[in-house]
C-alpha cells in the first residue's frame, strides 16, 4: 500500500510503538483517540485528506475504482464517491454478506443503496468479481504504520480482499492519529 497521505513524523502517535501490544489493545486505543474529536473536527480533517486523494495522479487516470462507504469514525468518502461517479468513473463498493465475507458491487447512485445490519450504506445489485479491472483502491483501517502494515476492525475482510486486487494501485487513508511507527502484525 502507499502512504503518501500519511502524517509527518511529528504527529502525536508517530513515535508510539505497538509491536509488543495486541491488536485488540491498539483498536481500543484508536477508538479512544477518535472520541477526543468532535464530528465537525473529523469532517474537517476528512476534507483535507480527500482533497489530497482527489489530486492523486493514479486516481485521475483510473477508470474502475474501489472505494468504501465511510462510517462516522472514518475518513468520509461520500462526496468522493459522488464526485467520481459524476465524472463517469466505475465505482465499486464493498458489501458485507456474512461475518467473514464481503463482496463488491457497482455503485449506481445513492438511491440504489440500502443500510446494512452494520449501519453502513451498501449498494444493491449484482456481485462484481472482475478484480483485474480495478485500477485504484482506497483502503480504510483502524491503524497503519511506516512499514505499510494495516490493522482493520478485526473481521479480516480486507486481509482476504487485498490479495485479490494485486494489480490495483492501493492508497490507504486515515487520520493522523491512526498512523504509528509500528503496529502489531
What are the language-model segments listed below?
Residues 2-132:
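N-terminal active-site beta-alpha-beta segment that forms phosphate/nucleotide-binding
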Residues 121-123, 140-143:
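A structured binding-face within diverse protein domains that lines the active/interaction site
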Residues 2-21, 25, 32-36, 132-137, ...:
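Surface-exposed, charge/polar-rich loops and edge strands
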Residues 60, 149-150:
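Alpha-helical protein-protein interaction elements
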Residues 78-82, 158-163:
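Short amphipathic alpha-helical segments and helix-helix/interface helices
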Residues 67, 139-140:
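Redox-cofactor binding/interface segments in oxidoreductases and associated redox assembly factors
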Residues 74, 145-146:
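Short glycine-rich, flexible loops that bind phosphorylated cofactors or substrates
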Amino acid at each position: 500500500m502507499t502512504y503518501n497521505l500519511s502524517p509527518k513524523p511529528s504527529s502525536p502517535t508517530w513515535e508510539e510503538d505497538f509491536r509488543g501490544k495486541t491488536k485488540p489493545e491498539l483498536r481500543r486505543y484508536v477508538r479512544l483517540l477518535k472520541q477526543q474529536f468532535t464530528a465537525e473536527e473529523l469532517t474537517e480533517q476528512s476534507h483535507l485528506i480527500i482533497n489530497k486523494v482527489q489530486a492523486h495522479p493514479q486516481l485521475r487516470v483510473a477508470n474502475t475504482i474501489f472505494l468504501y462507504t465511510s462510517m462516522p469514525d472514518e475518513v468520509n468518502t461520500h462526496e468522493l464517491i459522488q464526485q467520481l461517479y459524476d465524472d463517469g468513473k466505475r465505482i465499486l463498493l464493498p458489501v458485507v454478506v456474512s461475518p467473514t465475507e464481503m463482496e463488491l458491487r457497482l455503485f449506481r447512485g445513492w438511491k440504489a443503496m440500502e443500510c446494512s445490519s452494520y449501519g453502513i450504506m451498501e449498494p444493491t445489485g449484482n456481485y462484481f468479481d472482475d478484480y483485474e479491472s480495478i485500477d485504484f483502491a482506497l483502503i480504510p483501517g483502524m491503524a497503519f504504520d511506516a512499514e505499510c502494515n494495516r490493522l482493520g476492525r478485526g473481521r479480516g475482510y480486507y486481509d482476504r480482499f487485498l490479495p485479490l486486487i494485486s494489480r490495483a494501485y492501493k492508497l490507504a487513508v486515515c487520520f493522523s492519529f491512526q498512523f504509528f511507527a509500528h503496529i502489531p502484525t
